[in-house]
Amino acid sequence: MDLNFFHKTRILDGGMGQELLRRGMKPKGTLWSASALLDTNYHKLLLDTHLDFIKAGAEVIVTTSFATRKIRLLENKIEDKFEYLNKKAGEIAQNTKKYYPNVLIAGGLPPQNLTYKPDIRSDNKIRDDFFNQAKLLNPYIDFFYFDVLSSIREIKIGIESIREFHKPFLVGMHISEGTKLPSGEKISDLIDSLDINGLLGITLSCVSPENFQSNLDEIKSLGVPFGFKLNAYLKTNPMPKLDKTNKNQKVINPNELLGIREDLTPEKMAQFAKKFKDAGATIIGGCCETRPSHIEMFTGLKD
């Protein structure tokens, strides 16, 4: 694909997991969105949800692979489904091209351990986990998307792990609150230590609009295409409550755990997005609690 793809304004999809829950998916354990891959009765629902984001204006969709990482499957005692679930995520996303051949598929590579926390395991373990998931998604995708990573170390290891696939990548960093990653590092620390060969751009992922505003100047200073996947959660820092829920494998709708901001209507979120676009952001998308209606409003920001 064109490495300059994000040099102009592009629209990404929104929050697949919460949208699936709204549409009737019943989560199993802590699998959340992966429940729609595990149960064949939900495969059409998953495809239709991808398609609705595209109809709303998304030029890029992300595979539903956030909860198909190995640790999440181990928690739910279905690690034997690792290959099946990741391939199915790629296959269903790829099927959207039958209807919209120009849509791009991003292979979502989430943190390979806990969400919103830096991975303190060995480099080799992290690298192997990224590689094994990337290998399964690779045949179905146009580029890789590192989704909601919490440390520069994980980002660097993740990039190393995909090099043999010769595909470009988008980096999605997470900041729960303030101006530092959960690892304590600053955004500006990233670019100095990163091999940017194949880098499409950098986003802040699963962040509130206000949090992105706080970090706008620093991410802009990196000198690469930048943007966001905004969430509409009430809580900006879900730890440690999310930790406890994951460890107990408690079945809970993340909407109930983290809350929903009623003020972030599609119109209000589009106002934030316009402000960020006017400041130079070209990668515009949503994360948790952003629906096709939000993405439709974002399309008005296209160049």
Model region roles, listed by residue range:
Residues 1-303:
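Domain-level signal for soluble alpha/beta catalytic cores
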